[in-house]
A protein has these predicted regions:
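Bacterial N-terminal signal peptides that target proteins for export
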Residues: 1-9
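Bacterial N-terminal signal peptides
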Residues: 8-16
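Sec/Tat signal peptide C-region and signal peptidase I cleavage site
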Residues: 17-21
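A motif-centric signal for short, conserved binding hotspots located
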Residues: 22-623
Length: 623
């Protein structure tokens, strides 16, 4: 009787294999290791099923397993943001362990339990060999129970089910295993990727069975929020195979796979195709990878741009919002790839731009507390340019004036832009000066210096001054944003700074009778301020004289704002804050400015400026 039962089982096993093989032809694809198959590694033994299964005398568990199991200890996936804990190991003989008996690379295919070592020719494709360090592979065989997290589908924990409407993506005994996503017997259920997936995974359908971008939990930010309408979900740009951004024909169809790899990812902690910003290179570095092509962002960094991080200061999603010692500027610091979008009409300042949807920022009121996600663009900039420690003057950005009125941390722009500041450009608050603004244009000028751009409004953005010199928003053809510019300090347009060998001495870079057009040395100021008004001395009687003599606005005016002028001899209206690298005191009289008398006292370019009879008298110094 026992012999008959075994024989019947063997017949059933072989019939099942035969029946499965006849479903759509060569359904097991490269898992058919027999000679003449499409697999890169083939063996001398006939019978495609027998490389994995044995009708009897195998390991003896449910799949009738025949391939020798790997007994390695694995280094599981981990990250600073994962809610899952513990040293997860795939249980020996269970689903994932069976897959790893070939795919960890420590046991050669063909090492069968029943038939011994089968002679094999060729080798497995390198992307299919995972090794024993699984930190760069999607987590599986988790320590149960699965820990809930805002980006996971609620049903995973509450019901032990995915949200896949087809039911193909499923938990295995309450856990995520290889067979949650892969069917080892059918290679082409997804006819494009042909990665033995349990279903078609175009448009991220397989990933979205477990990951929910729309879920909310009190007090927690979902990092996937915004995905549904994001540019990486909707972009119809065609991709080519050489781009290495997935198998599908468009960015939207590749979806998650445009940036992430479930196995052997180069950026392990986030399963990125490349480490940190390198994951963005495939699409955002120009070339023919996308059609139609998109602006080459990475070319901007070759100009004067935000510095790329070194290997020791990479971005981490769990890092402090205020970047102190670990200072860096990666794509992910300013952009959230899940929520980033593209629009043809921009919201009014100071609201964040669609390309920065979902990024974190810092509250301007204290410079420390989180605003996540940012509401206003400047909140994201303040992660580095606010109260953070470790800021330093970077020579690559060019000459930096030293102001007569300056706080202890002169690189902290928060007090400079503050509403309480005597005067400031209206970045973190609405324009509030009671003084007339005769030079202020109704609309900003585009890069050509002629056509009108955005309405001036009552607030401006950081990127109105710090932007690509060829940005699309103001009439160029390049990328928007402060990635890089040919002008110093990542300024959108040319702006020359007056410089002198010592305070009060001759300025060495004068621009007499300057070109006040878009090509001139002060083009940035002309974006918002009418040059003819300034040259008409409508707000100060010496404007035309100073400009025609070749002095820069920077000798007398600061760009961001004054901060507190308490205890100083400078009243601070109209951003008057002298560069003390250029000007010096006039004898014993400290550097001073009075808006009430519209006059100053200082020495500049070997000329003494002194208050006399309610006006400034300028005289050359005696030699």
């Amino acid at each position: 009787m026992k012999v008959r039962l075994v024989f019947a089982g063997a017949i059933f096993f072989l019939m099942a294999c035969s029946a499965r093989a006849q479903v759509t032809g060569d359904v097991i694809g490269v898992h058919d290791l027999t000679a003449g198959s499409k697999s890169p590694i083939t063996g001398a033994r006939p019978g495609s099923c027998t490389y994995c299964h044995a009708p009897h005398s195998g390991i003896g568990n449910a799949p009738l397993w025949n391939q020798t199991l790997s007994v390695q200890t694995y280094t599981p996936y981990s990250s600073t943001t994962s809610a899952q804990t513990g040293n997860a190991q795939p249980p020996l003989g269970k689903d994932s362990s069976l897959c790893l008996s070939c795919h960890d690379g420590t046991v050669a295919p063909g090492q069968t339990v029943v038939y011994g070592a089968v002679t094999m020719t060729g080798s497995m494709a390198s992307p299919d060999v995972l090794g024993t360090n699984l930190q760069n592979s999607h987590p599986f065989s988790l320590v149960l129970p699965i820990k809930d997290s805002v980006e996971l589908a609620a049903s995973l924990v509450s019901q032990g089910k995915t949200t896949d409407p087809t039911g193909a993506v499923k938990l295995i005994l309450g856990n995520i295993e290889c067979t949650s996503c892969h069917d080892p017997h059918v290679q082409a259920k997804d006819p494009i990727s042909q990665n033995f997936l349990v279903r078609d995974s175009s448009n991220g359908q397989l990933c979205l069975a477990c990951h929910d971008p729309n879920r909310t939990m009190t007090g927690t930010v979902n990092p996937l929020n915004g995905w549904t309408a994001g540019i990486h979900t909707t972009a119809v740009n065609k991709t080519i195979a050489q781009a290495n951004v997935g198998s599908y024909p468009t960015v939207a169809q590749n979806a998650c796979l445009s940036c992430h790899l479930p196995h052997n990812a180069a950026g392990a902690a986030r399963l990125l195709r490349g480490p940190n910003e390198q994951a963005c290179l495939a699409c955002h570095a120009g070339g023919s990878n996308l059609s139609p092509s998109i602006p080459n962002v990475f070319a901007e960094f070759a100009k004067i741009g935000h510095p790329f991080p070194a290997g020791t200061n990479a971005h981490d999603t769990a890092e402090s919002l205020v970047l102190n010692s670990n200072r860096h500027a990666t794509c992910a610091d300013c952009h959230n790839g899940h929520a980033s979008n593209q629009v043809t009409a921009f919201p009014p300042p100071p609201l964040t731009r669609a390309s920065q949807n979902g990024v974190a920022g810092v509250n301007v009121s204290d410079g420390v507390s989180a605003v996540n996600p940012s509401v206003n663009q400047y909140e994201n900039c303040l992660r580095c340019h606010g109260t953070s420690a470790g800021k330093a003057v970077n020579p690559v950005f060019g000459y930096l004036p030293a102001r007569a009125v300056a706080s202890g941390d002169f690189l902290n722009v928060i007090p400079q832009f503050a509403y309480s500041s005597t005067s400031s450009h209206p970045v973190t608050h609405v324009r509030s000066s009671a003084l007339p603004q005769p030079s202020l244009l109704t609309n900003m000028l585009n890069l050509d210096g002629v056509t009108q751009g955005r309405s001036m409004g009552t607030e401006i953005l950081c990127t109105d001054c710090h932007n690509s010199d060829d940005n699309r928003e103001f009439g160029g053809v390049g990328p928007n944003g402060p990635h890089g510019s040919r002008w110093t300090h990542i300024l959108e347009r040319r702006y020359e700074f007056s410089q002198a060998p010592a305070p009060g001495q001759l300025v060495t870079n004068l621009f007499p009778n300057p070109d006040l057009s878009v090509n001139g040395p002060f083009a940035l100021c002309s974006k918002c301020h009418a040059a003819n008004q300034i040259m008409s001395n409508t707000s100060f009687s010496e404007h035309a004289r100073h400009i025609n003599d070749g002095f820069s606005c920077s000798a007398c005016h600061t760009a961001h704002g004054m901060g507190s002028t308490s205890g100083t001899t400078i009243s601070g209206e109209r951003l008057v804050n002298f560069d003390v690298n250029v000007v010096a005191p006039n004898g014993a009289t400290p550097i001073s400015y009075s808006r009430a008398s519209n006059s100053c006292s200082l020495t500049c370019h070997n000329h003494a400026h002194a208050l006399l009879g309610g006006a400034t008298v300028i005289k050359p110094l005696r030699k």
